[in-house]
Amino acid sequence: MAIEKHTIKVSTTGSSGSATGSLVTALPYCELLAARLAFHASAPGTTDTTLSSPGGPVSVTLLTITNSATDAWYYPTHQLDDSSGSAITGAYIPAVVHGNLLTELAGCDALTDALTMTIFVRV
């Protein structure tokens, strides 16, 4: 399996502290291994960031960061379940992207490239 790097830039529009923006990035079915969030220098600390994989088979939220414009690395995972559907303590796998990655910003200022995100996916 190969690892691919993608750079995603999201701009926001609207009023200061309540501007929003979103971008859908077409990806193959893959595992999201890491995401580096780098915010515009003027992005406020009220910024909310959500990564999700919309659509089929189901919409899945992969990462939610609230009230933060701090540059950071994230490694989204999902907890494994056993055959009865119970969570397995300490057992996690990379988050699965179902063909599209939706990046959404809220609570931001109106900024071009409010977020520059670098992701690494295993295809």
State each model region's role.
Residues 1-123:
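Surface-exposed, low-hydrophobicity beta-strand/loop segments enriched in small/polar/acidic residues
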